[in-house]
């Protein structure tokens, strides 16, 4: 018979810890949130601004494209500018095709980066593949940098895939093409990792990723990787898409894998709207981890969805205002009020669930529904503290939330 305990998250898979510029990935450390810029890295001003925005939003690692000499030459300047802003955020260099040459020609870039990302599907072709892969690994050893061996099904090693397809065709019970492709993705990652270790890069300097664009494929390849190795794993659904579709797909895929104890760092690859905010991918990654109970980044604002009893929009506007204020203030509050991430706020729209939900929060309000008395009881630490009335209920409650934060978290120190 099943019990409630059967539905708890599986224990985290034991993986080898990797130090990425002071941020620990794997080894039981909290799952790390990372992101990627979409600026031209050679445009130093734009890249610094976007990295800074991503880091302020909560990205603990930021990946930048290093695709040509001008980009490689800009990397140490970007790093220096960020340090002057007080941002010691580890930068990951994303290399394709000519990474071996760029790292060799730009030693300052090789030193400034905290990690190198290698794609075994395009690091080199035919006879040059292993040689150019080895050159990047040797650079990582020389500069004591970790690498992510990132396999992507859109640029999968075609020689390996063809060999597996040919072997499968001769099998008595052949697998589907999709299943063979999954196996090729896994083998590409593991064979590349084995080669890197053979060259001399220790396992605690290697992170693996296997990126696909379909939810079921992400679940499959990462589950297989987790079973066959103890490398730290980077999760991400490549080409997840725009808006709701991208958020839902990433959440469904990574949520399942994380629930099974798999994954040491995540990136949500959302296609931004034209002129959209790149930090959205950071917020979604944080929310995936937070709603699943793995990490806490920001106070939770619980709000009811509304129904026929809540024809007023006051509770919706209040919930939105509080959520926006929290996000705006978190960079300061995180330093000023240690532990504020654990705060729970409830903004409810009527008497049915309002009082009960508000009692479960640290501070909550039950606004009057349609036809109810125009009064809003406020609950603090599980007890009714006061009742707000009049036209300024929303503003009064917002002030109470700030006052609660100052009193509860303001006396703490970061060491507590």
UniProtKB/Swiss-Prot annotation:
Q: Which biological pathway?
A: Isoprenoid biosynthesis; isopentenyl diphosphate biosynthesis via DXP pathway; isopentenyl diphosphate from 1-deoxy-D-xylulose 5-phosphate: step 5/6
PANTHER family from the UniProt entry: 4-HYDROXY-3-METHYLBUT-2-EN-1-YL DIPHOSPHATE SYNTHASE (PTHR30454), 4-HYDROXY-3-METHYLBUT-2-EN-1-YL DIPHOSPHATE SYNTHASE (FERREDOXIN), CHLOROPLASTIC (PTHR30454:SF0)
InterPro entries given in the database record: Dihydropteroate_synth-like_sf, IspG_bac, IspG_bac-typ, NO2/SO3_Rdtase_4Fe4S_sf
Catalysed reaction(s)? (2E)-4-hydroxy-3-methylbut-2-enyl diphosphate + oxidized [flavodoxin] + H2O + 2 H(+) = 2-C-methyl-D-erythritol 2,4-cyclic diphosphate + reduced [flavodoxin]
**What does the note under cofactor report?**
Binds 1 [4Fe-4S] cluster.
Which organism encodes this protein? Rhizobium johnstonii (strain DSM 114642 / LMG 32736 / 3841) (Rhizobium leguminosarum bv. viciae)
Give the protein's cofactors: [4Fe-4S] cluster
SUPFAM superfamilies (UniProt xref): Nitrite and sulphite reductase 4Fe-4S domain-like (SSF56014)
- Protein name according to UniProt: 4-hydroxy-3-methylbut-2-en-1-yl diphosphate synthase (flavodoxin)
Q: Which UniProt keywords apply?
A: 4Fe-4S, Iron, Iron-sulfur, Isoprene biosynthesis, Metal-binding, Oxidoreductase
Q: What HAMAP family does this protein map onto?
A: IspG
Query: At which positions is [4Fe-4S] cluster bound?
Result: 304, 307, 350, 357
Q: What is its EC number?
A: 1.17.7.3
The taxonomic lineage of its organism, from the top, reads: Bacteria, Pseudomonadati, Pseudomonadota, Alphaproteobacteria, Hyphomicrobiales
Please state which protein family the record places this protein in: Belongs to the IspG family.
Q: Which Pfam families match?
A: GcpE
Signal peptide span: none
What role is this protein assigned?
Converts 2C-methyl-D-erythritol 2,4-cyclodiphosphate (ME-2,4cPP) into 1-hydroxy-2-methyl-2-(E)-butenyl 4-diphosphate.
The source's domain of life comes to: Bacteria
Q: Which GO terms describe its biological process?
A: isopentenyl diphosphate biosynthetic process, methylerythritol 4-phosphate pathway; terpenoid biosynthetic process
